[in-house]
Amino acid sequence: MSFTVVESRWPDVWLAATARGITICGDFLAATALALALQGAGAGGLAVSGLLLAATLPLVVLAPLAGRLADRVDSRTLLVTVGLAQAAICALLALADHPVLVVGLVALLACGLAVTQPCLAALLPAMVRSRDLPRASAISQTAVSLGALGGPVLAGLLVGQFGTRVPLLLDAATYLALVVAGLLLRTRRGGRRTTAVVTPADPRGTATAWRLRRDPLMLVMVVSTAVVIAAIGGINVIEVFFIRETLNGSPTTYGLVSAAWMAGMLPGGWLAARLANRLGDDAALIRGVLVTLAACSLMVLLAAMVPGAGLLVPLWLVAGAANGGENVFANLLTARRVPEAMRARAYASYGAAVQGGSMAGFLVGGALLTAVPPRPLIAGAGVAGILVVLIFVPVVARAVRRPSPGDPGVRQPRPADADAGLATPDGPAEPKPEAGDTVGSWLSASHVPGSGTSSS
């Protein structure tokens, strides 16, 4: 059974964003503490690499299953159950000493994130009407960015005073914010009943017929973003060597540069939200995604030319703003085109592509760094990102012209149960309102496009 609420539920938006920001802060706090714990225990680079892989791989491998689960199970049940499980896992992490046990617990934690991230991302469009989604996305991204900025700072204070156990216990407490949000949110989706502000999608198909591979614009967005991230993602491995060794920057400078990208995402998300309201069609949104990806790549290319580390700060601020804009455009495009009943799967697929691209960038950047100096590697990453965008420009042009299932004049397959549930033969897989559209690994401080997207 489904019913429609005409007005957007802003208290739900703020509650979900606050819970997400708190957990992100705890995650970045724990990431710093765990890295220090492994280093202090004498673990080498292999253990740290295993930690990063454990935090990322489940988000990629479990995406199809996790997205389906988030679409079919009541969101309140998922947030409360998984939030409690993640809090317990973080508490065990505070007591774990052996690197293998730490890596295993991190992998379990990431399994929970594979479910909660698409669950929260799919809830956001259900909380507001379509015209309010850009603003809601900006609010959510602001909370995530503030959490990601505050976590490492808090870690620097707590680890020096109390060691690693207190930060990990604090991270466990932050997951209780998900539990509270799950209990208090009026908006619910999944399960047998949906209580939502139903956003009219342009899904190019019914809930049973929609597939990512059949939606050319969505497919282009996912693939182009993943490939650009793979191209420039290696800077997260190279950056510390470039700043500290090539540019002779201080640890303080390195910290400022690292924070600049995330800081730039704050105004970038809000600027994109204002612009998104003027973009009346999906083609304009996918072009916005390409423009922002190109801007990120250009800033990376320019970074290879700077004579001093301090000049990286303004470049990273601009790149972060473009990254924030890309997140808003991608969230809005997904909410517009994907039926409500399948949005968690779509967000999970997008998140898996982002994480897969990040993993590829880490591996390639780390491998090349053993043989090539940092400066030419950063320049190569920027050039590669720009080339990828240029390659996808004609692909987008063809995708815009190509009819999608659900476009006028394209016959829809009528499922046997077309008159039941959300799917209808003549419209989106959700009822229309009576009146009157965010995803990244918790352990990675990555600041390439897609990071800090909540699926956000």
Spans of model-derived segments:
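Short, intrinsically disordered terminal tails adjacent to the first/last structured region
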Residues: 1-3, 408-456
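Alpha-helical transmembrane-bundle signature of multi-pass membrane transport and export proteins
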Residues: 1-415, 427, 455
